[in-house]
Amino acid sequence: MKITLRMMVLAVLTAMAMVLAACGGGGSSGGSTGGGSGSGPVTIEIGSKGEELAFDKTELTVSAGQTVTIRFKNNSAVQQHNWILVKGGEAEAANIANAGLSAGPAANYLPADKSNIIAESPLANGNETVEVTFTAPAAGTYLYICTVPGHYPLMQGKLVVN
């Protein structure tokens, strides 16, 4: 397999992100929120933490079958971000993020095969707000991530579906 510059950069960024995450404190970095107990439509506001590679909420709660609108605010002035809800665990989230690298910005940094993606926002440019509406899946815990190259290791959270 030929190792390209792009692959080397992704590997270095991923390794750096893992080191930074391992050095982080043990405290909570985000709250739980959501409109979860009802069955009516709910809008949840979430954003990025300024120029950090982090969501401002790391856990959201909704009810199975509920119509959910995620209003994602990119609070960075310069970076692009997105909000992607993944069907499957961490391995599937990593596969989606890695495939997004090859897909590029024209494809929202998402693979052509979206069978393991429950919901996806458009790319949000600096200080832009985007929305995605979907029906909450069956009860369980699902990961949401940003698939912009290098962001996935730090930009993830959990959607808890009751």
From Swiss-Prot:
Monomer. Residues 42-162 form the Plastocyanin-like domain. Probably a soluble electron acceptor for the integral membrane protein electron transfer alternative complex III (ACIII). Residues 1-22 form the signal peptide. Binds 1 copper ion per subunit. InterPro entries: BlueCu_1 (IPR000923), BlueCu_1_BS (IPR028871), Cu-binding_ET (IPR050845), Cupredoxin (IPR008972). It is found in: Cell membrane. Its cofactor is Cu cation. GO terms for molecular function: copper ion binding; electron transfer activity; oxidoreductase activity. SUPFAM superfamilies: Cupredoxins. Cu cation binds at residues 81, 146, 151, 155. It is a lipid-anchor. This is Auracyanin-A. Keywords: Cell membrane, Copper, Electron transport, Lipoprotein, Membrane, Metal-binding, Palmitate, Signal, Transport. It comes from Chloroflexus aurantiacus (strain ATCC 29366 / DSM 635 / J-10-fl). The lineage of its organism: Bacteria, Bacillati, Chloroflexota, Chloroflexia, Chloroflexales. Its main location: membrane. One of its GO terms (cellular component) is plasma membrane. Belongs to the multicopper oxidase family. GO terms for biological process: photosynthetic electron transport chain. CDD domains: Azurin_like. It comes from the Bacteria. The keyword Electron transport applies.
